[in-house]
Design a protein with these regions (language model features):
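Conserved small/polar residues in nucleotide/adenosyl-binding loops
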Residues: 147-153
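Acidic, glycine-enriched active-site microenvironments
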Residues: 125, 140-142
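Short secondary-structure capping/junction motifs at helix and strand boundaries
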Residues: 129-137
Length: 157
């Protein structure tokens, strides 16, 4: 993946601004976890001290990554919402419907045959709503997400 360094710089500048505002609102230094969480408050929430076990806090992700077995229902629900595009970058990874039985080549061929309709739906729906699609055999969701799609302190769901 080619990273857009302007986007990265803006993200980290915004991160620093949000952490600074949170530290001022809380009135003390923040732990690393608090910095990451305060930096991802939903846009309508303002930084303030949150009492553990008492407060309800809305967070926004930087990215959504879905695997093929659950993305089907998620995309159907998204389609029902009437939105034309996703609000944050999102990807579908076709990896969970590939059985590990006879070796990579045979397993991929079997999955392509068995799940052809599912993969066609995922690719089509992803394309229609601006969602990236990692086709079967393109990689396993976890290492792909961490090596190609995110950066330190970014929140991925």
């Amino acid at each position: 993946m080619a990273f857009d360094f302007d986007v990265i710089q803006r993200f980290y500048q915004r991160l620093a601004e949000r952490v600074s505002a949170a530290r001022e609102a809380v009135g003390r230094p923040l732990t690393y976890a608090e910095k990451v969480l305060y930096a991802h408050l939903w846009s309508s929430d303002r930084p303030r001290p949150f009492k553990r076990g008492d407060a309800y806090v809305n967070f926004g992700p930087d990215r959504v990554a879905m695997q093929d077995a659950t993305a089907q229902m998620a995309l159907l629900q998204f389609m029902q919402a009437g939105k034309s595009r996703v609000a944050v970058p999102a990807t579908v990874h076709a990896d969970h419907l590939i059985p590990a039985k006879n070796g990579a080549g045979l397993d991929l061929a079997a999955a392509l045959d068995m799940n052809r309709e599912v993969y066609a739906f995922l690719a089509s729906a992803s394309s229609a709503y601006g969602i990236g699609f990692w086709k079967p055999g393109a990689g396993i969701i976890h290492p792909v997400s961490y090596t190609h799609l995110t950066l330190p302190t970014k929140r991925i769901v």
